[in-house]
């Protein structure tokens, strides 16, 4: 099973640290964040695909000399493609059910359970959601009986459909990646998921 980790961002909020080191290689308790993410993956994920833009040479060099116990494929972006475009750029390495992570996610989610839940529901996509007190700075999700019915981007205060936000962790079938347009800068969260609600089953955990 593959996992895609989206590590193409510029890390502007962490400057000046990211002026010289790409954000995925910044240490989190003495281990680069992306390596920590890889080492925490379930054993069933044996291949990790890194969608990389900024800091490509440093990422290539790091994983050339570092054994993380899994096959690592680095897929370069000539220019940032957004979350959806980056996933599409990795499509040729996807063979089936795939876990996808935003590159700055440190999660307590039990991924084995999430994968099994996804398969038991025969879903095309399963999204991890997180409950927050103030969802207005985020995209929120409306649920009915566990199924995602609507996405709402940064709702005005008092107009929120819920207080559940996207946690940046997905289990996806190849059908979802296949409908992303090629060679476009596109957001999976804002441009793709809202369009497929009702056509391809999206659920939450």
Predicted regions and their residues:
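Catalytic-core segments of class I nucleotidyltransferases/pyrophosphorylases
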Residues: 98-99, 106, 112-119, 133, ...
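Short, well-ordered beta-strand micro-motif
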Residues: 27, 47, 142, 171-173
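A structural signal for short hydrophobic beta-strand segments in well-ordered beta-sheet cores
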Residues: 25, 140-143, 193
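Residues at the starts of beta-strands that form the adenosine-phosphate
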Residues: 2, 46-48, 71, 124, ...
């Amino acid at each position: 099973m593959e996992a895609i980790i989206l590590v193409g961002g510029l890390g502007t909020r962490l400057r000046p640290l990211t002026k010289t080191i790409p954000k995925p290689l910044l240490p989190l308790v003495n281990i680069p964040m992306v390596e920590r993410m890889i080492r925490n993956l379930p054993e069933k994920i044996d291949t990790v695909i890194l969608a990389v833009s900024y800091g490509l040479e440093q990422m290539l060099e790091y994983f050339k000399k570092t054994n993380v116990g899994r096959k690592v494929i680095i897929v370069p972006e000539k220019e940032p493609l957004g979350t959806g475009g980056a996933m599409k750029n990795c499509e040729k390495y996807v063979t089936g059910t795939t876990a996808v992570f935003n590159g700055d996610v440190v999660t307590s989610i039990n991924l084995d359970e999430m994968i099994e839940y996804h398969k038991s529901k025969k879903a095309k996509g399963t999204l991890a959601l997180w409950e927050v007190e103030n969802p207005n700075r985020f995209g929120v999700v409306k649920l009915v009986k566990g199924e995602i019915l609507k996405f709402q981007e940064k709702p005005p205060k008092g107009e929120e459909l819920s207080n559940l936000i996207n946690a940046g962790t997905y289990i996806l079938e190849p059908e979802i990646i296949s409908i992303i347009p090629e060679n476009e800068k596109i957001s999976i969260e804002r441009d793709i998921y809202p369009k497929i609600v009702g056509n391809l089953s999206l659920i939450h955990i």
